[in-house]
């Protein structure tokens, strides 16, 4: 099915939108020359540049500047039973790797246990991204905190080219997490690895008057900006669903131009604001695919990919939509996401 058909009645809304907030000429648009154009002038060492090129240079999107990553850390983050019950095949780590390879992904991101179980067989066949920290839901009552499950050196020794970590910005533990992840990323760069940060918000006060601002463009944009400050090479963020979190909750510092000139209510403009907060796209923005909703997954994934690409983002990191269904359907979904980035007619807004 063609991309335009999957978008349905809103195809023109997404495909023909012109961004009049932050001009595309200001954005470092992903392309085959990302290493030379962006990272060559940075303080990243030669080995880290090699690791970034390994990510950029694998899978169906190889050497386009875009990335498609399969993340499967939900066995810890959301519990293994809840995550894999729809398709028990993925209790076995090898099938996670097979989905990423057969799905044409640039890389697979998962836990120390998952990747370590099959590292000798697969680390040279697809780039590994080891997730350093997790929140687990077996503590009662549930507490939301990211804790380290292993070390950067362990990730290096299993052949990983990159490490990933989550910070719950806005949470009581966020400042400790910032310090921990900053130190881990510094060491990863020293060892020649790339770094990816899950820049998530977590605070019950971010829900106000029936509106959830955990995906507000202004709040997520600032989370991204802190993330690139501690030298994330790629930032993972939820696609913005609203704006004005700072104003609604009544905290932080704002400028009215953030809302009147730099954003509108169009999802591409809201995502463009996220991209801008990653040093105008120098640090690539990958948006998350979100939970699986069944029949609408393909449509939802294509919408997210189109918004991300047209905003100036670098790609999609889609897990549950891909692995909570038969493998052939998961492969089809991943390939369809990649088709958006391979389609030259889908341009930067």
Residue ranges and their predicted role:
Residues 1-78, 83, 116-125, 273:
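N-terminal amphipathic alpha-helix/helix-capping segment at the start of soluble metabolic enzymes
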Residues 2, 130, 345-349:
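Short, highly charged low-complexity linear segments
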Residues 24-29, 62, 75-286, 295-315, ...:
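Alpha/beta enzyme core
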Residues 42, 264, 294-295, 327:
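Hydrophobic alpha-helical scaffolding
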Residues 169-171, 291-293, 322-324:
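Short histidine/acidic/glycine/proline-rich micro-motifs that form metal-
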Residues 285-291, 318-321:
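Glycine-rich beta-strand-to-loop/alpha-helix junction loops that act as flexible
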Residues 311-312, 322-349:
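C-terminal helical cap(s) of enzyme catalytic domains, especially alpha/beta-barrels
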């Amino acid at each position: 099915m063609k991309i335009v058909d999957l978008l349905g009645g809103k195809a023109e809304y997404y495909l023909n939108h012109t961004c009049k907030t932050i001009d595309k000429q200001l954005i470092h648009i992903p392309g085959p020359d990302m290493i030379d154009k962006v990272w060559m002038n940075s303080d990243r060492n030669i080995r880290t540049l090699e690791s970034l090129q390994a990510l950029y240079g694998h899978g169906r999107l190889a050497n386009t500047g875009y990335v498609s990553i399969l993340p499967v850390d939900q066995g810890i983050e959301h519990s293994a039973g809840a995550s894999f019950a729809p398709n028990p095949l993925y209790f076995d780590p090898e099938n996670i790797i097979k989905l990423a390879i057969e799905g044409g992904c640039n890389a697979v991101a998962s836990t120390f246990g998952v990747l370590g179980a099959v590292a000798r067989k697969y680390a040279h066949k697809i780039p590994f991204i080891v997730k350093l920290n997790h929140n687990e839901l077996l503590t009662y009552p549930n507490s939301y905190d990211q804790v380290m499950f292993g070390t950067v050196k362990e990730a290096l020794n299993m052949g990983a080219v990159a490490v990933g970590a989550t910070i719950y910005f806005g949470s009581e533990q966020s400042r400790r997490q910032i310090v921990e992840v900053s130190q881990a990323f510094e060491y990863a760069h020293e060892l020649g690895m790339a770094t990816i940060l899950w820049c998530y918000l977590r605070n019950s006060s971010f829900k106000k008057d029936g509106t959830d601002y955990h995906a507000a463009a202004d709040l997520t944009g600032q989370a991204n900006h802190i993330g690139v400050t501690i030298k994330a090479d790629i930032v993972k963020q939820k696609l913005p669903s609203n704006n004005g979190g700072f104003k609604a909750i009544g905290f932080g510092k704002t400028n009215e131009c953030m809302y009147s000139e730099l954003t509108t209510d169009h999802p591409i403009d809201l995502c463009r604001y996220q991209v801008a907060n990653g040093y105008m796209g120098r640090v690539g923005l990958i948006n998350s695919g979100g939970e699986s909703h069944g029949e609408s997954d393909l449509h939802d994934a294509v919408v997210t990919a189109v918004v991300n690409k047209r905003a100036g983002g670098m790609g999609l990191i889609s897990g549950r939509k891909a692995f909570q269904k038969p493998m052939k359907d998961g492969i089809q979904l991943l390939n369809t996401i990649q088709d958006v980035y391979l389609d030259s007619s889908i341009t930067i807004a």
